[in-house]
Amino acid sequence: MLTMRICLRATYTQKEYKWESTVNEQISAASLYDRVARVIPKAEWMGFQDDVEAILELKRKRNAVILAHNYQTPEIFHGVADIVGDSLALARKAMEVEADVIVLAGVHFMAETAKLLNPEKTVLIPDMAAGCSLADSITPEDIALLRKAYPGVPVVTYVNTSAAVKAASDICCTSGNARQVVESLGVPRVLMLPDEYLAKNVAKETSVELIAWRGHCEVHELFTADDIRELRESHPGVIVLAHPECPPEVVDAADFSGSTAVMSDYVGRERPARVVLLTECSMSDNVAVHHPDVEFIRPCNLCPHMKRITLGNIRTALEENRHEVTVDPAIAGAARRAVERMLQI
């Protein structure tokens, strides 16, 4: 049975979004609330206000910026983030950051990627335990064995991996550019790691033979085709959008599939009367604020790793320089090349 959630708040999301006010402009949490009043109840905001004020001041003092993934909660996304987006957007924007300090409000592989692209900057992650089931599913040793089993076949690695795994790969991809990356190699066969479902879903869109691994996202693997049938019965006319990390039978049963950025674009372009986004809970909240005329049906699969990031530990990270992210110099160069090669496409 699909668990449903009624959510009374939403947040902004785009492929990238930057507050007009950044680290150099004086803002107070009180004045900021005018921007978020429609998405965060006043009583709840009052509990966040001290941390928001402190973080805004710390950003000014330290010349810091906060990059936040689309799955972050509203008080982070609205209250303190400078740049928000999906994995691809954050990787691209990380290359343009001019601040001295980057705080990555997301999971560990994202912070590592930011460090790879900004080796001279201080990169902090508020909670070092904010991991990823996909990143944990594969090691450099696994890739070495795969290269022996498939000699000469290039390795495309999802960005949801450790720096060590990226270093053992030829090029990275995200859910938003996977097909383009695979086809850019100009070869008939590719090892596409580690997300089995992403590889199988991309394989339906390309003539390139994709050899998959057995990793899965613990959020997206929970969705089923039965969930979609239940949603259609309970909510006639609903348009179903599925993330490509969902099982292939889920993607097949959906009306449309794409990354979080692509889903957001779809809603803005098509303006469905009723829609469900099969991805992490916060994504529906994020998109809904732009489209008050669209009814969002919210299945609830939370990412426990993303939700480890809080205003409190963002504040502590900035106050104490806690959880600075480092990448072993022995692998940093190769990992950076794999990411940069992706960004050139």
UniProtKB/Swiss-Prot annotation:
GO terms classed as biological process: 'de novo' NAD biosynthetic process from L-aspartate
Assigned EC number: 2.5.1.72
GO cellular component: cytosol
Subcellular location as annotated: Cytoplasm
Keywords per UniProt: 4Fe-4S, Cytoplasm, Iron, Iron-sulfur, Metal-binding, Pyridine nucleotide biosynthesis, Transferase
Cofactor binding note: Binds 1 [4Fe-4S] cluster per subunit.
Pathway: Cofactor biosynthesis; NAD(+) biosynthesis; quinolinate from iminoaspartate: step 1/1
Residues engaged in binding iminosuccinate: 69, 87, 158-160, 175, 243-245, 260
GO molecular function, one term: metal ion binding
Cofactor(s) this protein cannot do without: [4Fe-4S] cluster
InterPro entries cross-referenced by the UniProt entry: NadA (IPR003473), NadA_sf (IPR036094), Quinolinate_synth_type2 (IPR023066)
Chain sites annotated for binding [4Fe-4S] cluster: 132, 217, 303
Pfam families: NadA
Primary subcellular site in the record, as a coarse category: cytoplasm
SUPFAM superfamilies in the record: NadA-like
Keyword Hydrolase: no
Entry-linked PANTHER family: QUINOLINATE SYNTHASE, CHLOROPLASTIC, QUINOLINATE SYNTHETASE A
UniProt record similarity statement: Belongs to the quinolinate synthase family. Type 2 subfamily.
Known role: Catalyzes the condensation of iminoaspartate with dihydroxyacetone phosphate to form quinolinate.
Name the UniProt record assigns to this protein: Quinolinate synthase
Annotated source species: Agrobacterium fabrum (strain C58 / ATCC 33970) (Agrobacterium tumefaciens (strain C58))
Encoding gene, per UniProt annotation: nadA
